């Protein structure tokens, strides 16, 4: 067997394999003889079919079978000998075997990048630290009161804080636009859930007295056809409701399963939950900062095949989040634009390659004590912690998920050892509800929803 390897563009390689005709013919003849012993053909007794008849009828199909199997065996051998690790499925051609000629084929594929990890070497990395304050707890209590308002209908003009039920229709240049209308839509004025100016334009409105408002979509709005454009909305208020905040008493505390201790017990419970979530978020953000720092000093060429595969995973994840179930074979997945997922896919592939190499270099293995400690930590947030522990321990897949999280923490800790750390204090709200750096994620989600709605309406 002869093998040649040609470097194409980037990580792409072209492997040419040539198998001697003698080996091919020997394998084809062997299979035809074996077939002759058991094949049934009208006019001949089983096992008595002349070889030439078998060869005439089955030679082409047997050669195709031999070609497929030879590609599998010889390509694997060629990759092993040349230390090539494909990043995706090879594109192989041709697969035909011509009688009397060497079997020659080519395989084109991307290889996994070969690189050495560059350490941070005391490069500065800014991490964050935060804690839950009394003010944070009080703010959370007020949010819970807002969420538990008792609403009653009123007849006065709309004011900020009221809840309205509206019908509306949006127009661009006097023409209705897709996704710009709704009936019986509930909206709390001042919630900021609509585009700027929309909610303010409803203030002062009255029941069953239609009016128009003009608003402009933000320049960075997710739907490109609407971004930066001025729209007119025709609005009719069907109902106005005023909210009354519940009193801070034992009855309020009981709504959150507080049996004893009233509001003070509720505050304690809220503080513990907030602290747990804050710790989780801070750890996640710091881990991401450490990973980003490692990525910034390790520029790796990324295989397109891996990026494409990750994009497909992200598409299915998006489908699951929006429709609440996994994609089924008979269901149509909307044709999401590639750019919706490309940046995130590239980051995942980059980080995955670095992670694997870093673990190998530093011989990092998931510590059993840390795995069990993480399971205990998860379990502590549940009413029946033993059941959750049993669930994780019931399958290798569940345990593997925890082991992967532990490995991430161990890698992050190792990166931190090699960095010059400094800390920035952030308040609870800034950590849990970041205002900057999330616009793009929100825009992507908005685009996805708009696309899906368009597809569903088109169908």
Curated annotation (Swiss-Prot):
The keyword Transcription does not apply. Its main location: cytoplasm. Its EC number is 5.2.1.8. The keyword Thylakoid does not apply. One of its GO terms (cellular component) is cytoplasm. It catalyses: [protein]-peptidylproline (omega=180) = [protein]-peptidylproline (omega=0). InterPro entries: PPIase_dom_sf, PPIase_FKBP_dom, Trig_fac, Trigger_fac_C, Trigger_fac_C_sf, Trigger_fac_ribosome-bd_bac, Trigger_fac_ribosome-bd_sf, Trigger_fact/SurA_dom_sf. One of its GO terms (molecular function) is peptidyl-prolyl cis-trans isomerase activity. Keywords: Cell cycle, Cell division, Chaperone, Cytoplasm, Isomerase, Rotamase. Pfam families: FKBP_C, Trigger_C, Trigger_N. PANTHER family: TRIGGER FACTOR CHAPERONE AND PEPTIDYL-PROLYL CIS/TRANS ISOMERASE, TRIGGER FACTOR-LIKE PROTEIN TIG, CHLOROPLASTIC. Consists of 3 domains; the N-terminus binds the ribosome, the middle domain has PPIase activity, while the C-terminus has intrinsic chaperone activity on its own. HAMAP family: Trigger_factor_Tig. This is Trigger factor. It comes from Legionella pneumophila (strain Corby). The lineage of its organism: Bacteria, Pseudomonadati, Pseudomonadota, Gammaproteobacteria, Legionellales.
